[in-house]
């Protein structure tokens, strides 16, 4: 099995629960949600919890370790759900 680490970058305001439910329903082994304290994305808008802003769209990263082909198939089937996310893959070795 060729496991990879998939990271899904999004903002807190986007529907995080939908993402997690899709991963769960898709048979993905597990997912971890990490919330950033500051960041910016493609729109070049800075988000931080230390600066008073009208919107607290703080960055969120969902990490998943799973078989590469399974993740690619999952993303093809759920393209519409994750269309506004930035997604990366990294090779990993899973300790057993």
From Swiss-Prot:
Origin: domain of life: Bacteria
Lineage: Bacteria, Pseudomonadati, Aquificota, Aquificia, Aquificales
Species of provenance: Aquifex aeolicus (strain VF5)
Family annotation (PANTHER family): UPF0166 PROTEIN TM_0021 (PTHR35983:SF1)
SUPFAM superfamilies for the chain: GlnB-like
Name recorded for this polypeptide: UPF0166 protein aq_448
Gene3D superfamilies (alphabetical): 3.30.70.120
Sequence similarity: Belongs to the UPF0166 family.
């Amino acid at each position: 099995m060729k496991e990879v680490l998939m990271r899904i970058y999004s903002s807190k305001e986007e529907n995080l629960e939908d993402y997690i439910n899709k991963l769960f329903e898709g048979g993905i082994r597990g997912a971890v949600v990490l919330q950033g304290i500051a960041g910016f994305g493609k729109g070049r808008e800075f988000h931080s919890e230390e600066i008073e802003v009208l919107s607290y769209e703080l960055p969120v990263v969902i990490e998943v370790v799973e078989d590469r082909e399974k993740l690619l198939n999952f993303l093809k089937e759920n393209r519409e759900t994750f269309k506004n996310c930035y997604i990366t893959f990294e090779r990993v070795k899973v300790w057993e």
